[in-house]
């Protein structure tokens, strides 16, 4: 069953057709990877779906509800959340408070994080449990700025996950980390997301990661979809080999 659908979605920047008439469907429960070379349109597509950009034309639906021109806040309430390629944390807050702030925002009680006496015990407990799920529970009281890069990536995903989304976008969750940290991040994220029955769309450049963890892979090229299918089909696709992998099948 489809959770998200775009119809003839377009976004142009001058002569650059960043997203050029894209019809995109994300099915409930998928762990989907969105791949392509730099400038292919991946991040622009996610920015359109998460309301960081408005489309020039086309439509966006979540569970058949038209959200094309709704705000970021309205899309969060509709069940869309995301993490960022450049980690977007409150560095002066503790690791625990970063997650708690996301939970308070979900509950419409953001200001309470600034008043320790008003902090809800249940919220802080939920935040602590989420950190354990993501493997960084031991760092709960540490300042976010003091985390290692891999830990910061996990915290960024945990902050988005704390919103209890139906659809979670992860923008290059393994960029800038070691091979060992990539495996730890993806093992953890895949386990938590699948365990929570969350639908995930991951922008990723490392094709080893893509082929190992994805149910489905969508390849973008010059603002359009070049290929769409299970990992084994994408591996054998001659167009993908030419434009993305730089090889011939």
Regions found by a protein language model. Name each.
Residues 2-249:
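Glycine-rich phosphate-binding loops of nucleotide-dependent enzymes
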């Amino acid at each position: 069953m489809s959770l998200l659908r775009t119809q003839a979605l377009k976004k142009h920047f001058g002569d650059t057709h960043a997203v050029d008439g894209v019809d995109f469907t994300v099915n409930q429960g998928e762990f989907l990877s969105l791949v392509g070379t730099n400038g292919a349109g991946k991040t622009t597509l996610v920015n359109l779906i998460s309301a960081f950009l408005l489309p020039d034309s086309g439509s966006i639906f979540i569970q058949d509800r038209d959200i094309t021109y709704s705000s970021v806040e309205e899309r969060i309430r509709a069940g869309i959340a995301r993490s960022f390629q450049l980690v977007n944390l409150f560095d002066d807050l503790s690791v625990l408070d970063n997650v708690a702030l996301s939970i308070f925002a979900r509950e419409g009680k953001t200001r309470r994080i600034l008043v320790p006496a008003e902090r809800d015990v249940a919220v802080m407990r939920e935040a602590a449990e989420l950190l354990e799920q993501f493997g960084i529970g031991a760092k709960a009281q540490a300042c976010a700025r003091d985390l290692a890069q891999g830990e910061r990536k996990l915290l960024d995903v945990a902050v988005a996950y704390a919103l209890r989304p139906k659809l979670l976008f992860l923008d290059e969750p393994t960029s800038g980390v070691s091979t060992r940290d990539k495996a730890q991040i993806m093992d953890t994220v895949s386990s938590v997301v699948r365990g929570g029955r969350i639908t995930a769309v991951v922008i990723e450049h490392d094709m080893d990661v893509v082929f190992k963890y994805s149910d489905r892979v969508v390849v973008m090229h010059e603002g359009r979809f070049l290929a769409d299918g299970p990992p084994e089909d994408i591996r054998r696709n001659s167009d993908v080999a030419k434009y993305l992998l730089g090889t011939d099948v």
